[in-house]
């Protein structure tokens, strides 16, 4: 992207700018050599696109194709500023540091993180590129909202380039316990990068508390010591003459839109058709996940296999549909994980299936949105069993689609959603017997009990939607310039060791 051409078209005029690793559309190269834009998948796009349209903002991000030089464009009413990434950038910044270093570290070391200096150097370089693109696009005094773990250095870089703008940062994945984060060789640089923001947001209070501890320990900052609440009771970090707010803002979905779509006659007809295509089983279990080692797909497969072996679930009237969206297909750990999951699927079907009646129906491809909603409506039991997940919007999407008060949600305790969806069948994914018990209970739940649970879940999801999430974050960001009692102690001593155990 040419900075000059970008500036001459739509750069420098945006009062509200979203900065994310990806644009809300993908650049697709066609066989004839031409290109076209198509909507890209992902919870972040779902969450922020409606907000951008309402506020007529700009989006800074990568177009999804390496070595592509694209000019800023207006697509479906959105101003988009593509950031160029080379194939080497993708390998080192994205597949390397972002997804083989940060991702496993922030997800409790389910897979061992890799630390390579050349990956870190490229992460710094690409973050600077994003910061410079944002500085060109933002109008004087603009509000900038930076998204997620790939861009944790951008707040400080942008602060140095454009001290006039108001900067928010939100982390969409879990923020790790202090003792895990301390393993990172570049831990101080990342904390300092985040402290360039006026407001740093996490899904849960525990992640925010962890960040306060690290701010004291790694940069010697004065911080507030009181507990942080959800969308309230913010923490504060004193950085020179600036005060950085730290808060918890659980992300959500456009629940009203999903609720309306799930009531659509064509969707409900398709749900009935899905049941018929599956042989009209008594119970349909459903898993919908990006193919990732954090999602616990193997956990539910092992649980199902043992339940079938123990005859606690009948193989002739129960099926599992597992929809697995392809992800990071060039990363070794993901290649091995896919092979293992598909081996487990084959084992279950070989042991317990019949000709024309597999137990597990496994699809490894993206599913169109309306088709996914029909699966949500058709499914009797939704299995959401991650080993660690910042929030998990699939759980909320399933609930939003169940206006009939049918269905049951089996939900890992180690998702951010579990803090809100307390009426789900909560499970510890590391306790296989416990997972089996809750799946069995969900499959056999009393209809009245099921309605009571689903009614409570829907009350939560419909009231706390994505608009409320975005509004609460942006209201808090707008208030960062206000003065008042900071609650910051006069001490800059390191946190006591007990603080490092905060979740």
UniProtKB/Swiss-Prot annotation:
Record's keyword terms, sorted: Glycosyltransferase, Transferase
Activity regulation details: Stimulated by the polynucleotide FII (physiological activator), and by chondroitin sulfate (CS) and heparin. Activation by the polyanion is inhibited by high salt concentration as well as by high concentrations of mononucleoside phosphates.
GO molecular function, one term: alpha,alpha-trehalose-phosphate synthase (GDP-forming) activity
EC annotation from Swiss-Prot or TrEMBL: 2.4.1.15, 2.4.1.347
Coiled coil: none
UniProt-annotated site: Involved in alpha anomer selectivity, residues: 103, 173
Thermal behaviour (record text): About 60% of the activity is lost in the absence of FII after 10 minutes at 40 degrees Celsius, but only 35% in the presence of FII.
Pathway it works in: Glycan biosynthesis; trehalose biosynthesis
Keyword Transferase: yes
Any one Gene Ontology cellular component term annotated for this protein: cytosol
A Pfam family that the UniProt record links to this protein: Glyco_transf_20
Residues where D-glucose 6-phosphate binds: 22, 94, 148, 328
Knockout or disruption consequences: Cells lacking this gene do not accumulate ADP-glucose, however combined inactivation of both glgM and ostA accumulates ADP-glucose.
Class of the enzyme per the UniProt entry, highest EC level: transferase
Role, per record: Involved in the production of glycogen and alpha-glucan via the TreS-Pep2 branch involved in the biosynthesis of maltose-1-phosphate (M1P), and probably in the osmoprotection via the biosynthesis of trehalose. Catalyzes the transfer of glucose from UDP-glucose (UDP-Glc) to glucose-6-phosphate (Glc-6-P) to form trehalose-6-phosphate. ADP-Glc, CDP-Glc, GDP-Glc and TDP-Glc are also glucosyl donors, however, when the pyrimidine sugar nucleotides (CDP-Glc, TDP-Glc and UDP-Glc) are used as substrates, there is an absolute requirement for a high molecular weight polyanion for activity.
Family to which this protein belongs: Belongs to the glycosyltransferase 20 family.
Subunit structure: Homotetramer.
Name this protein carries in UniProt: Trehalose-6-phosphate synthase
Gene that produces this protein: otsA
């Amino acid at each position: 992207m040419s900075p000059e051409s970008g500036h001459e078209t739509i750069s420098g005029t945006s009062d509200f700018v979203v900065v994310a690793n990806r644009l809300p559309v993908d650049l697709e190269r066609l066989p004839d050599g031409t290109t076209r834009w198509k909507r890209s998948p992902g919870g972040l796009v779902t969450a922020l696109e409606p907000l951008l349209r309402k506020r007529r903002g700009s989006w800074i991000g990568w177009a999804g194709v390496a070595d592509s030089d694209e000019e800023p464009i207006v697509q479906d009413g959105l101003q988009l500023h593509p950031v160029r990434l080379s194939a080497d950038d993708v390998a080192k910044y994205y597949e390397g540091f972002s997804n083989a270093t940060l991702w496993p570290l922030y997800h409790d070391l389910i897979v061992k993180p890799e630390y390579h200096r050349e990956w870190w150097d490229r992460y710094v370089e690409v973050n600077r590129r994003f910061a410079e693109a944002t500085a060109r696009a933002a109008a004087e005094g603009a509000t900038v909202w930076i998204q997620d773990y790939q861009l944790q250095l951008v707040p400080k870089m942008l602060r140095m380039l454009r001290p006039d703008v108001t900067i928010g940062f939100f982390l969409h994945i879990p923020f790790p316990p202090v003792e895990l984060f301390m393993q990172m060789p570049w831990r101080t640089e990342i904390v300092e990068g985040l402290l360039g923001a006026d407001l740093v947001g996490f899904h849960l209070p525990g992640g925010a508390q962890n960040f306060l501890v690290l701010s004291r320990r790694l940069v010697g900052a004065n911080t507030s010591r009181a507990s942080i609440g959800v969308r309230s009771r913010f923490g504060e970090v004193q950085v020179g003459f600036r005060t950085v707010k730290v808060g918890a803002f659980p992300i959500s979905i456009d629940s009203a839109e999903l609720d309306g779509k799930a009531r659509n006659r064509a969707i409900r007809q398709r749900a009935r058709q899905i049941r018929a295509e599956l042989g009209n089983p008594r119970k349909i279990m459903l898993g919908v996940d990006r193919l990732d080692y954090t999602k616990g797909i193997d956990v539910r497969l092992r649980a199902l296999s043992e339940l079938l072996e123990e005859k606690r679930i009948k193989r002739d009237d129960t099926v599992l549909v597992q929809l697995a969206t392809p992800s990071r297909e060039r990363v070794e750990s993901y290649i091995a994980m896919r092979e293992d999951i598909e081996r487990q699927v084959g084992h279950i079907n070989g042991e317990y299936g019949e000709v024309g009646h597999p137990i597990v129906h496994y699809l490894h491809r993206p599913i169109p949105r309306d088709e996914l909603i029909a699966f949500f409506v058709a499914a009797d039991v939704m299995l959401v069993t991650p080993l660690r997940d910042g929030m998990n919007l699939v759980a909320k999407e399933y609930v939003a689609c169940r206006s009939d008060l049918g269905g049951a949600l089996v939900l890992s305790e180690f998702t951010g959603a579990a803090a809100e969806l307390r009426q789900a069948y909560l499970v510890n994914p590391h306790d296989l017997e416990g997972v089996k018990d809750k799946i069995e209970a969900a499959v056999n739940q009393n209809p009245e009990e099921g309605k009571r649970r689903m009614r409570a879940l829907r009350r939560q999801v419909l009231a706390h939607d994505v608009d409320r999430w975005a509004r609460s974050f942006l209201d808090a960001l707008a208030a960062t310039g206000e003065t008042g009692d900071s609650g910051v102690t006069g001490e800059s001593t390191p946190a006591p060791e007990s603080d490092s155990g905060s979740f």
